[in-house]
């Protein structure tokens, strides 16, 4: 169960960006440990292998992006690091756009690359 005293950070990475996400988490482990973590399924598995506790949703194509989007609406997410592969084709593109749109609607900070992710985790 997430700690109510910690902010919640959602971590999502497309397949071509999962290695970057794991490297980012490892490079920033002291800061990342200050958050409750939630992630899409496969990304969450890799983050667990890096030694962190994470609440895993379904994988993105199976509805994980939509599950995280619902948590945005419910006020359970404080920030999102979403390392997207802008050159890839994703069958669940509507869910991705929904997550991005709801982050904007609910004014949730969203980082889509390593530079902005580094700023986001320090600012939350």
Where is each model-derived feature located?
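Nucleotide donor/acceptor-binding cores
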Residues: 6-8
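Short, glycine-rich nucleotide/cofactor-binding loops
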Residues: 10-18
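Histidine-anchored nucleotide/phosphate-binding helix
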Residues: 19-30
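Short internal beta-strands
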Residues: 34-43
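Short hydrophobic/aromatic-enriched beta-strand-loop microsegments
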Residues: 36, 53-63
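Mid-chain, well-packed structural core segment of small domains
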Residues: 63-102
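Ser/Thr/Gly-rich flexible loops in soluble cytosolic domains mediating phosphotransfer, phosphorylation
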Residues: 88, 96-124
């Amino acid at each position: 169960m997430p700690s109510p005293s910690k902010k919640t950070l959602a971590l999502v990475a497309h397949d071509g960006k999962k290695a970057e996400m794991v490297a980012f988490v490892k490079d920033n482990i002291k800061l990342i440990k200050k958050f409750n973590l939630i992630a899409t399924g496969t990304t969450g598995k890799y983050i667990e292998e890096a030694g962190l506790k994470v609440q895993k949703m379904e994988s993105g194509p199976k509805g994980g992006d939509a599950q995280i989007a619902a948590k945005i609406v419910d006020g359970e997410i404080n920030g999102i690091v979403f390392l997207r592969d802008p050159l890839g084709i994703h069958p669940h593109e509507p869910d991705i756009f929904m997550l991005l749109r709801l982050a904007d609607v609910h004014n949730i900070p969203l980082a889509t690359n390593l530079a902005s992710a580094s700023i986001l985790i320090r600012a939350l």
